[in-house]
Amino acid sequence: MSNPRILIVGPPGAGKGTQSANLAEAYGVEHITTGDALRANKDMDISDMDTEYDTPREYMEAGDLVPDAVVNAIVDEALSQADGFVLDGYPRNLEQAEELEGMTALDVILSLDVSREELVDRLTGRRVCDDCGTNYHVEFNQPEEDGVCDECGGDLIQRDDDNEESVRNRLDVFDDNTAPVIDHYGDHDGFVAIDGEQTPDEVWSEIQDAVDAHTA
């Protein structure tokens, strides 16, 4: 199969973004994230959806949660335009998972498994370039010069939501809402659990084996 349809799931900090980028490049498919899809369709007319606002942009600018119905419509539009994809960041709950089943079939579902304490260490140690967004880590992905981005020379910062209290709250939200999605897909023929605590290269090797085995 030349253009696989891949879903990658896992908690914040599991490495979904890194491995999704690898998948998109290696298999020539589109990397679709909820955030990117929302930004690309922020002026979409949703006035017929009985929502508070008429466009996703208004929700985003107000800092309000975009309703599931709007997110579903935007993801559906993105998937309909993609010839093969890796979907990252959706579905976030069982209702969205049920909607996704009506949008497309999935060939492979990759679940990145990482322990909570490892996730806390990863996320609280993350540093992000304030200019270009490149990610670093205080332990295992340090810049050449402390506090300075290798790519653009910008300042490295800790995001406000990467402090320990916020991280643990985010993981609680994941456990409550998104972990049941992983259980939901457990019986899917293409479901593969990946040990996300390996090195990124080891994780990538295991992912390639899984995708190749389910899309041959």
UniProtKB/Swiss-Prot annotation:
Can you state which reaction this protein catalyses?
A: AMP + ATP = 2 ADP
Biological process (GO) annotations held by this record are: AMP salvage
One term of GO molecular function: adenylate kinase activity
Chain intervals for the UniProt region annotation (LID) = 125-162
Pfam families listed in its UniProt record: ADK, ADK_lid
Q: Where in the cell is it found?
A: Cytoplasm
UniProt keywords (A-Z) are: ATP-binding, Cytoplasm, Kinase, Metal-binding, Nucleotide biosynthesis, Nucleotide-binding, Transferase, Zinc
Q: Where does AMP bind?
A: 34, 39, 64-66, 89-92, 96, 159, 170
Q: Which residues bind ATP?
A: 13-18, 126, 198
Where does this protein chiefly localize? Answer: cytoplasm
Top enzyme class, one word, equals: transferase
Q: In which pathway does it act?
A: Purine metabolism; AMP biosynthesis via salvage pathway; AMP from ADP: step 1/1
Q: How does it assemble?
A: Monomer.
This chain's function reads: Catalyzes the reversible transfer of the terminal phosphate group between ATP and AMP. Plays an important role in cellular energy homeostasis and in adenine nucleotide metabolism.
Q: What is this protein called?
A: Adenylate kinase
Organism, scientific name: Haloarcula marismortui (strain ATCC 43049 / DSM 3752 / JCM 8966 / VKM B-1809)
